[in-house]
C-alpha cells in the first residue's frame, strides 16, 4: 500500500472503482484536528431549560479556565543556559583575563555574554538602582514644598531672563572669537582662510597658535583617518622610537577601544635605528603592556622587523579565514614613517616618502598579498591644549620652512640633545647661548647675509631639520624599569642617551658623521644583527638629496584614484619582493586617491568621527 497519491493511481491503473472511503489512502487517517472536533461532539451538548436558554454550557462552550499544573521546563526559554553563581564568577574572571590580554583575541565576542563580563555584577546593580530611584521617587519628594531633591542652580528665573542670558553669552563668545582670530593671524581673514572656514573653526584653545601648528588636525585629515579605521581590520599605530610618548595617539586607541573593539591594534615602533637598542627594547616593553608591539627600521634595502610584521599580518589573515581579504591601516603622527613601512613591506617604493611631514595627503590602498591590503593614512595630530608649538615642531609635525623665527626653538633642541653630540655633529665648541651657537655655525658654514651678517634664520632651520631627520642623535629614555625586568639603561648617564663607543671612535678617526646612517651606528654597535643602520644611500638621504636638488621624490608611478574602477591590477613581474612569492599569490596593485578636494588649512579642533554613511567607504 502506498501513499494516497500512489494508491489512487494504482486503483485507476487496475481499473477498480471503489466508493469505500475507508480504503487506506487519502483521508484514511484522521488528523489531530479532526479527532478534537469529534471528541467535542462526544462530550455532549449544552443543557437548556424549558425556554431553550443554555443552563449548562457544553464543554466546548465553557469559558472557565481549566485548572492545570504545568511542569516547568527550561526549554521554554529557548537558547538559555543555567549556571550556578560560582561557575558564573569563575567564567567571568577567566574571560575578563583573556579580554584584557593584548596577545589573545576573542573571536565571536558577540556570542559571549560580554555585558556580564564588562559591567560586572556591581556595576549592573548600581545601574539598576539608579534607574529604580528615578522610577520610584514619588512626586511629593521631587516637587512641591516637601521636595527633597536639590534644585538646579539657575541664574535666571523667567524665560525673559534666559533670553537675556543667552544673548549676553553669544556676544561674549563673538568677542572672544574675534580676539583669538586676531591673535592667531587669521585677522581680516588674510590668513588665507575663507569666511566660512573661520566660522567653522573651534577657537576654544587657550593660547592662540600659528596656523601651521594646526597641521594634521583638519577635519579633512580626521575624516581620512576615520575612513581608514572603518575600512581596516588591523590597525598599525606607527610610533617614532625617538619620542614614543609624544607620537602616541591615545585618541585613536580610545576610539578603537570604545567604538571598534573587534579591530586589532598593533604598535609599530619605527626608526629604531636612531635609538640605542636597549632603549628600543625598553620602550617595546612599556608599549607591549597595552598592545602587541613590533620594532621596525623601514628601509627598502636593509629593513629590520619586516619578517615578523609580515608574519603577524599573516596570522591575522588566518584568524579571519572567513574573509576574502583583510585590510591593514597604518595610522600615526605625520613623518613617523607610515609610507616607509609600506615600502619596506613591499620591498620597493610604492608609496610617496619624504623627510617632510604631510606628504601623504589622502588614504591609499596597496596590496601586500592577495589576502592582505595595506592602507596608508595621512599623518594625524590629536588636538591637545597642552601641546605647545615647540612640542609640535620637535615631534616633526610641522614643516620647518614655514616656521617664523625658527631660532626661538633652538634652546629646546639644545636642551634635548647632549652638548657633546652637538659639538661632534657640527664640530663646534664653546657657545654661550643659542644665538651665539647659530652665529658660530653660520660663520663656519659661510652662511652670511648681505653685510656679513650671519644667516641665523637659515641656520636655525637647518638645525631643526637635522634634529627631525635623525642627523643629530637624540632620544627619549624609557621609564624606569620595574621590579623583575632585566633590561636596563646602564652605562647611560643623564636624561638623554650617549653615543656608542664605535661612533665616538669613528668620529675621532674621521670627519663627523651627520647622516642617519651614523646615528644608526649606535644601535648597530649594540646589536649588530638587529640594527645594521641605514646604508649611506638610505631612503632619507636619497630623498633629502632629491629634495635639495628640487627633484621628484620616489612616488608610486601608478597612483589610481580610489574611485577609479580598476580595483585590482595584476602586477606579477616586480622584483625584489619576497612578499610577492607568498603562497597566496601575487596580484599586486596600488591604488591612491589623487584629488585633493579641500584645503588642508581648515583646522578643526574637534576630530569627532562623521556619521558612518558620510565617510567614503571602499566596501
Ligand atoms: N632613520 C630612519 N628613517 C626613517 C625610518 N622610517 C622612515 N624614515 C624617514 O622618515 C621620513 C618620513 O617618512 P614617511 O614614510 O614619509 O613618513 P609618513 O608617516 O608617511 O609621513 P606623512 O606623509 O607625513 O604621513 C622619511 O625621510 C624616511 O626616510 C626608519 O626606520 N629609520
Curated annotation (Swiss-Prot):
Biased composition regions of type Basic and acidic residues, renumbered to the chain: 1-10, 489-500, 547-556
Keywords assigned: GTP-binding, Nucleotide-binding, Nucleus, Ribosome biogenesis
Signal sequence extent: none
One record GO biological process: ribosome biogenesis
Pfam families: MMR_HSR1, NGP1NT
Biased composition (Acidic residues): 536-546, 565-603
Residue sites binding GTP per the record: 332-339, 376-380
Compartments, record wording: Nucleus, Nucleolus
Cellular compartments per GO CC: nucleolus
Major site of localization recorded for this protein: nucleus
Top-level division of the source organism's lineage: Eukaryota
GO molecular function: GTP binding
SUPFAM superfamilies membership: P-loop containing nucleoside triphosphate hydrolases
Domain annotation CP-type G: ranges: 222-383
Region (Disordered): 1-24, 473-619
Main function: GTPase that associates with pre-60S ribosomal subunits in the nucleolus and is required for their nuclear export and maturation.
Protein family per UniProt: Belongs to the TRAFAC class YlqF/YawG GTPase family. NOG2 subfamily.
Protein known as: Nucleolar GTP-binding protein 2
The species this protein was found in: Neurospora crassa (strain ATCC 24698 / 74-OR23-1A / CBS 708.71 / DSM 1257 / FGSC 987)
Amino acid at each position: 500500500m502506498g501513499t494516497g497519491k500512489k494508491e489512487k493511481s494504482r486503483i485507476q491503473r487496475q481499473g477498480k472503482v471503489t466508493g469505500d472511503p475507508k480504503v487506506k489512502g487519502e483521508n484514511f487517517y484522521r488528523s489531530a484536528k479532526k479527532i478534537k472536533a469529534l471528541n467535542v461532539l462526544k462530550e455532549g451538548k449544552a443543557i437548556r431549560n424549558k425556554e431553550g436558554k443554555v443552563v449548562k454550557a457544553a464543554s466546548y462552550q465553557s469559558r472557565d479556565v481549566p485548572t492545570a499544573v504545568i511542569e516547568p521546563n527550561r526549554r521554554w526559554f529557548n537558547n538559555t543556559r543555567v549556571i550556578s553563581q560560582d561557575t558564573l564568577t569563575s567564567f567571568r574572571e577567566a574571560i575578563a583575563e583573556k579580554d584584557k590580554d593584548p596577545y589573545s583575541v576573542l573571536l565571536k565576542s558577540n556570542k559571549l555574554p560580554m555585558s556580564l563580563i564588562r559591567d560586572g555584577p556591581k556595576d549592573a546593580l548600581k545601574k539598576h538602582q539608579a534607574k529604580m530611584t528615578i522610577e520610584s521617587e514619588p512626586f511629593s519628594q521631587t516637587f512641591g514644598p516637601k521636595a527633597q531633591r536639590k534644585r538646579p542652580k539657575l541664574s535666571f528665573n523667567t524665560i525673559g531672563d534666559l533670553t537675556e542670558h543667552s544673548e549676553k553669552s553669544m556676544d561674549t563668545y563673538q568677542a572672544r572669537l574675534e580676539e583669538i582670530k586676531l591673535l592667531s593671524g587669521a585677522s581680516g581673514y588674510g590668513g588665507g582662510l575663507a569666511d566660512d572656514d573661520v566660522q567653522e573653526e573651534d577657537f576654544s584653545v587657550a593660547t592662540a597658535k600659528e596656523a601651521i601648528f594646526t597641521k594634521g588636525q583638519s577635519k579633512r585629515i580626521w575624516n581620512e583617518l576615520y575612513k581608514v579605521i572603518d575600512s581596516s581590520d588591523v590597525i598599525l599605530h606607527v610610533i617614532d622610537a625617538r619620542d614614543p610618548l609624544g607620537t602616541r595617539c591615545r585618541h585613536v586607541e580610545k576610539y578603537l577601544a570604545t567604538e571598534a573593539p573587534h579591530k586589532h591594534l598593533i604598535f609599530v615602533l619605527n626608526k629604531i635605528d636612531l635609538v640605542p637598542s636597549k632603549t628600543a627594547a625598553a620602550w617595546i616593553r612599556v608599549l607591549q603592556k597595552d598592545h602587541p608591539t613590533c620594532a621596525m627600521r623601514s628601509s627598502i634595502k636593509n629593513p629590520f622587523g619586516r619578517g615578523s610584521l609580515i608574519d603577524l599580518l599573516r596570522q591575522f589573515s588566518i584568524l579571519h579565514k572567513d574573509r576574502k581579504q583583510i585590510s591593514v591601516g597604518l595610522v600615526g603622527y605625520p613623518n613617523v614613517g607610515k609610507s616607509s613601512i609600506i615600502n619596506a613591506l613591499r620591498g620597493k617604493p610604492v608609496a610617496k616618502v619624504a623627510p617632510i611631514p604631510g606628504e601623504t595627503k589622502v588614504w591609499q590602498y596597496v596590496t601586500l598579498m592577495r589576502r592582505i591590503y595595506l592602507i596608508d593614512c595621512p599623518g594625524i595630530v590629536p588636538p591637545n591644549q597642552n601641546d605647545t608649538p615647540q612640542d609640535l615642531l620637535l615631534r616633526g609635525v610641522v614643516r620647518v620652512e614655514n616656521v617664523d623665527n625658527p631660532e626661538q626653538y633652538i634652546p629646546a633642541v639644545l636642551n634635548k640633545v647632549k652638548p657633546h653630540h652637538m659639538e661632534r655633529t657640527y664640530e663646534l665648541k664653546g657657545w654661550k647661548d643659542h644665538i651665539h651657537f647659530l652665529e658660530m655655525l653660520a660663520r663656519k658654514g659661510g652662511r652670511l647675509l648681505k653685510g656679513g651678517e650671519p644667516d641665523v634664520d637659515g641656520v636655525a632651520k637647518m638645525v631643526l631639520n637635522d634634529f627631525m631627520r635623525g642627523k643629530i642623535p637624540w632620544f627619549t629614555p624609557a621609564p624606569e624599569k620595574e621590579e623583575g625586568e632585566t633590561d636596563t639603561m646602564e652605562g647611560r648617564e643623564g636624561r638623554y642617551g650617549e653615543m656608542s663607543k664605535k661612533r665616538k671612535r669613528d668620529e675621532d678617526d674621521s670627519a663627523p658623521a651627520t647622516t642617519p646612517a651614523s646615528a644608526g651606528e649606535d644601535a648597530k654597535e649594540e646589536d649588530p644583527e638587529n640594527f645594521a643602520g641605514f646604508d649611506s644611500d638610505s631612503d632619507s638621504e636619497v630623498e633629502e638629496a632629491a629634495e635639495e636638488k628640487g627633484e621628484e621624490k620616489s612616488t608610486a608611478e601608478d597612483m589610481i584614484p580610489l574611485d577609479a574602477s580598476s580595483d585590482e591590477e595584476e602586477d606579477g613581474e616586480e622584483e625584489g619582493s619576497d612578499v610577492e612569492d607568498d603562497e597566496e599569490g601575487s596580484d599586486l596593485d596600488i591604488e591612491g586617491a589623487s584629488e585633493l578636494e579641500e584645503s588642508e588649512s581648515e583646522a578643526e579642533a574637534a576630530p569627532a568621527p562623521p556619521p558612518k554613511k558620510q565617510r567614503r567607504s571602499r566596501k
